[in-house]
Amino acid sequence: MSILCWDNMRPDCKRWKVSPYEERNCNWVAVFDFDKEKEGIVIEEHDKLSETENPSYGGYDIVGKVPEEIIIPFKWDYARVFYSEQNPIIVVGNYTGKKVGNFLGAANEIKCAILDTNQRPLSSFIFDRVSIGWSCQDLRFHIGNYGADINLAKDEFIYAVPFLNYDSCDEEGHRIWGTPFKNLRCFIDTETTGLPINDNLPYTELDNWPHLVQVALIIEDDNYGILAKRNMILKPDGYSIPESSARIHGIANAQAIKVGEDRKHVIGFLDQVLSNSNIVIGHNVSFDLNVVKAEIIRVKGIENALFTTKNHNVVDTMKMGMNICKIPNLSFHTHMSQPYKYPKLDELYYKLFNKHFNNQHDAMADVQAAYDCYYELKRKSQ
């Protein structure tokens, strides 16, 4: 099996080895020889990698369990590929399988394609500089079955999931139009700098909505289950986290400055996720969506926001759980029309599982609790 690429492979890369992630210096499971005349790579020996957790080669990591047919050592000439307007084309032997390894690049805007040997496209995707940032230094690609990360410099990560619309082929080579993800769902929870001035105002009223402090996501679909989990604290940029809010979620302004991720990178990722998700799920999820959308517009501008092209189905576990918890509504104004109040996340969780969940008001803990509640509520409704 050969892997052919353009002549923009790094000329100093003569040989690569693949090993388990935790054992970089031993137990090699595959060797790749760079063949300059063929402008690509020839796989010299190839053991089965599907059971290997987190294989890695020379600082270029593969995350998760990756099927052996998509272990591909991409090593690009960054300046020529990512800074040009060319479309890099990757041909992977005679591979026409249904699984396509995702690839993440950085450029002003660049369209990539993966083709089979008959020049039929298996996948294509576009990344833009606004969404994922830009750097020519210390790039490290993480190539996985469902998503990819970039390490821009040191340990500063930006996250992106290249949701691919692709023209695939079945085992007999017949084309199948569609997407590798079916019914993509995004579970989301946020922690913020405070509360909105008016809950009823739209997210476009930016002064009304608080800033994002922490956001956690669980992304899944019908075909593959959970595709990604992300837990991100944002580095404050032009605002600060009030002590009153920090007392609730435990993230002080100094901590966010120290450990937070670049705001633009996180926002670019969130915009990609929202623009590709079919369903968005959470507890009091309208609040989370308004906060995230307002932040996307602050960073990118509404004219560049990708999520505006998507009409999501929104599912709120708070509303789903109201008639399960049946907590009396003591509000004089709404009691007659709504005898039960909306449950807090922990109230719903306790009702469903007869226990409290830990680390409340941590976005990752909250989104996991909402995820568990959603599927338990679905089970009870069957």
Language-model segments: which ranges?
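Short acidic, Gly/Ser-rich segments with clustered Asp/Glu that frequently serve as metal-coordination loops
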Residues: 190-198, 203
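Metal-dependent phosphoesterase core characteristic of DEDDh/y 3'-5' exonuclease domains
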Residues: 198, 208-215, 219-251, 271-382
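A generic structural signal for short coil/turn motifs at secondary-structure boundaries
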Residues: 100-102, 257, 358-359
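Short glycine-aspartate micro-motif
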Residues: 185-187
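Metal-dependent phosphoesterase signature
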Residues: 247-268
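Short linear loop/turn motifs
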Residues: 78, 128-132, 260-263, 360-370
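Residue-level detector of conserved, function-critical positions
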Residues: 1-180
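Short, surface-exposed loop/turn motifs at beta-strand boundaries within globular domains
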Residues: 181-183, 210
